[in-house]
Amino acid sequence: MKMEDPIVIFGKWAEEGKDLGMEKGHANSVKKMLEFACKERADLGKKFSFLDVGCGNGWVVRDIGENKLCGRAVGIDGAQQMIANAESRDKKNEYIQTDIDSYTPFKRFDLIHSMEVFYYLKNPSKTIKRICDNWLNPNGRLIIGIDRYYENFQSHSWEEKVGTPMHLIKEQKWKAILEKSGFFGVKTWRVNPSKDWKGTLVITGKTK
């Protein structure tokens, strides 16, 4: 089976309106991730900047952009069609079509979020290291959600079903990647598990 670039796949999904299904399917997990991250920002009581990595149609950026403490909300995505969908729905916030593997922001962020993106990247470890070194402000937080990981056996067949390359990494390996990249206080947990579904794996850590 010939594998396609993930950007091509997601571009097609955007054109077909599947981005709305992705939004609905990920909403509960993302809500819990953002509740955790935004409570921390609220406790600090300071304005913060936000980046969504793999923003799709911009639904998370739009949501965080309404937070009274959010001074700037940005979404990046590799698929131009996704960015077009985001910009058509939102004139307030900022969207950038870019290669996530090589992107470097001109201004650092306080909170970086990503849902269902990092196992598609060519080199997740390298990108996470760059996020720690170059994307986040001191005392910034990265929070990632993924549904495809080794312990979630239902996700093992996705690469073949979707037809695009995907990493399959164990939970403790994801934690180790963040720690090796320079993040501290790294934690993992799972949200919305069910009988045959291990739930979304959340990995998060802070910069010094």
Tell me what each language-model feature is.
Residues 125-138:
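A short glycine-rich, Lys/Arg-flanked "PGG" loop and its adjoining helix->strand segment in the class I
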